[in-house]
Amino acid sequence: MFSRTLTRKSIQSSLRQAEKLRSALQGADAVVVGAGAGLSTSAGFVYNGERFQQYFCDFASKYGFSDMYSGGFYPYEILEEYWAYWSRYIWVNRYMNAPKPVYEDLLALVKDKDYFVITTNVDHQFQKAGFDKHRLFYTQGDYGLFQCSQPCCQKTYDNEETVRQMMEQQRNMRVPSELVPRCPVCGRPMTMNLRCDDTFVENEGWHRAAERYSEFLRRHKGLKTLFLDLGTGMNTPTIVKFSFWRMANEWPDAAYACINLGEAYAPKEIEAKSICINADIGSVLKQI
């Protein structure tokens, strides 16, 4: 009895907040989307359970992994096994299509607005869904790029064809030695272009995107701007969440909206200009 009542109230509250968000979107001069892992989770990119077992059951059996993240951090003894794991990881989370059209639904809501996207996600789903690449800033890298593990230079390299070959030719949890990627400049092993430590490569494209984002914020500071926080958590809060809170507080005509199942909240300083929806992102986007 109690659970039904709470669920009904929760649904009604979510619908009311979705209506407020629809109105805020319609009235905004600009929309700044900040996206985190929760957005891709809503789109079906889950890293454990059935999806993990489908693609990594052999690694799970050998090493006892229960999710993709665990396997990604494991210190494999040989590069051939390391790349057998990572080529699958990259393929299913970067080159395969998302199971649900959440990114496409988001694009439909903002495509006619003056928008910009900043994201800590590295799965390239915004571009795959049709977002303008000149309105995207991937701060933490891209599964689709290799870099030198040293690194000896600030260069990145597209990896789709190499990853495809490693997927097709691996046997017994190992890729052929000749497919192990090495830096074309210094010959050292390559790694993914992911921000894990101070070896992360910020190439020319990264810096151009950072400047476009900064310029977008400068141009819209005095306008009605909606900061739309989708699925960001507290792993790297300074990149999206904290900066959105600060700008929503400092800009008189700005508003903040957050959709995130289990983590939808805003500080008291901006409570009056915030819309927080504790629900699945994809479900809410369909209500707007």
Roles of regions detected by a PLM:
Residues 1-288:
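Conserved catalytic alpha/beta core of Sir2/sirtuin-type deacylases, generalized to analogous enzyme cores
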